[in-house]
Amino acid sequence: GVTVAITGGSVYVRVGNGTNYRIITTVKAGMTFDHIATARNGWNAIVINGQVGWVSGKYSKVV
């Protein structure tokens, strides 16, 4: 897939693929972003505000 759709209600975007990484911003369900990569643990890398951010695979899907 080329885009990542946010499926959770309100999801943190982080600088890395885990909850221990710093939060960049919050995104909402229904928003879509360019998909860069998916980590082994299921987190998806997206482009947001010109930078790379990561969202949990529990709350996002590649479409």
Name these PLM-found stretches.
Residues 1-4, 59-63:
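Intrinsically disordered, low-complexity Ser/Thr-rich linker and spacer segments
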Residues 3-7, 34-36:
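A structural signal for short, hydrophobic beta-strand segments that form beta-sheets
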Residues 6, 10, 29:
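Glycine- and aspartate-rich repeat motifs characteristic of hemolysin/RTX-like Ca2+-binding segments
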Residues 17-22:
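Short alpha-helix capping/helix-loop boundary micro-motifs
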Residues 25-58:
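SH3/SH3-like beta-barrel superfamily modules
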